[in-house]
Amino acid sequence: ETFETIFHGSEEERFYHEAGEDKGFMEDTGNHDARTEGMSYGMMVCLQLDKKEEFDRLWKWTRTYMYMDEGPGKNYFAWSCALDGTRNADGPAPDGEEYFAMALFFASRRWGDGEGIFNYSREAKAILHECVHKGEPGHPGDPMWEPSNKLIKFVPGLDFSDPSYHLPHFY
């Protein structure tokens, strides 16, 4: 019942909205935007409840609008987008990437890998590779995990963490 309300309830009740033929997003109702945190949590809920269509819609919206293919955040996800997909941010929030990777690994096990962006395990590995290896020789940018202590950062360019980003049950 809760899933149905959040994903398919009335316009006043739901957080999930379909966009076009094959995309969907989770609205942060307090800020009227879509955030990597909410998108990745939505994917995790869909995964746990075996809702592949909604999962794929969320992932496609994320890859279409949030994925950054240039600049310092290249191969990361913009942490906030307007509901039309316009980016509100040029940088990531590492908890989103962390949840995206885990949801994609779980999706690979539940539904198997598909083609393109729906090759879930390949996408998850690519996210984690960027998160860990940015900043190494030949790989510009800042990693999401601090190499010296292995703690996830609050944002890649800063040297402090956020305790809410630590998800030991993922490892």
Spans of features found by a protein language model:
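Hydrophobic alpha-helical segments with transmembrane-like composition
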Residues: 102-110, 164-170
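Extended ligand-binding clefts on enzyme/binding-domain cores
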Residues: 1-9, 14-15, 29-36, 71-74, ...
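N-terminal carbohydrate-binding/catalytic regions of secreted carbohydrate-active enzymes
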Residues: 1-97, 103, 110-113
